């Protein structure tokens, strides 16, 4: 069985936690990591690691001294990525993004997220977005991929400067780039 088919089956089986039927496209990977700076991004936090597609792209865009902390609720996905990505900059945490702040002891340069906000409660969404905003350094980004524009207003209420991009793919993938300016 091909890797792509295995991934599709794994994602479909876990649809409520992945929010996707397949891995993100190369275009999404490039766009969502656009604001990671090789010079200034020292700490990047990823929500929803899945099988590590975005994780690999994030690592490609980080400098050698940077750290990536990736959160994933699915133990099998954590094991898979731990077995397939060998990079000292990567720390994998098998926990919900709701709890991310208890693992941090410094400000964050970038958040990269693919978690399905459509399947989270209002309380969970509020906790994640508000704590992410508080944890971000000034002029830093929270970038999110979703299959709908529906949640964009939730991001606009919290972040200072917001942009939504439709990459014209099928299924439709939207990238939200949300910046903390202060």
Task: Specify the residue positions occupied by each region the protein language model found.
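Class I SAM-dependent methyltransferase Rossmann-like catalytic core
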Residues: 3-36
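Conserved class I S-adenosyl-L-methionine
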Residues: 41-50
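Glycine-rich SAM-binding Motif I of class I
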Residues: 52-56
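Conserved SAM/SAH-binding beta-strand->alpha-helix loop
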Residues: 74
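Conserved SAM-binding strand-loop segment of SAM-dependent methyltransferases
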Residues: 88-97
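A short acidic, Gly/Pro-enriched loop at the edge of an enzyme's catalytic core
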Residues: 102-111
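A short glycine-rich, Lys/Arg-flanked "PGG" loop and its adjoining helix->strand segment in the class I
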Residues: 126-138
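Conserved beta-strand signature within the Rossmann-like core of class I S-adenosyl-L-methionine
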Residues: 139-146
């Amino acid at each position: 069985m091909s890797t792509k088919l295995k991934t599709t089956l794994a994602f479909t089986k876990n649809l409520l936690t992945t929010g996707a039927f397949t891995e993100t496209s190369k275009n999404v990977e490039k766009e969502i990591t656009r604001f990671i700076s090789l010079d200034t991004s020292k700490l990047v936090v990823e929500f929803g690691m899945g099988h590590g597609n975005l994780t690999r792209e994030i690592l490609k865009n980080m400098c050698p001294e940077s750290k990536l902390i990736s959160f994933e609720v699915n133990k099998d996905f954590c094991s898979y990525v731990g077995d397939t990505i060998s990079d000292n900059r990567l720390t994998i945490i098998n926990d919900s993004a709701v709890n991310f702040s208890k693992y941090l002891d410094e400000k964050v340069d970038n958040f990269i997220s693919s978690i399905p906000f459509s399947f989270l409660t209002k309380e969970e969404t509020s906790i994640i977005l508000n704590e992410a905003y508080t944890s971000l350094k000034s002029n830093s980004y929270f970038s999110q991929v979703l299959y709908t524009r529906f949640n964009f207003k939730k991001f606009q209420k919290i972040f200072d400067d917001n942009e939504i991009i439709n990459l014209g793919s099928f299924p439709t993938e939207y990238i939200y780039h949300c910046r903390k300016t202060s």
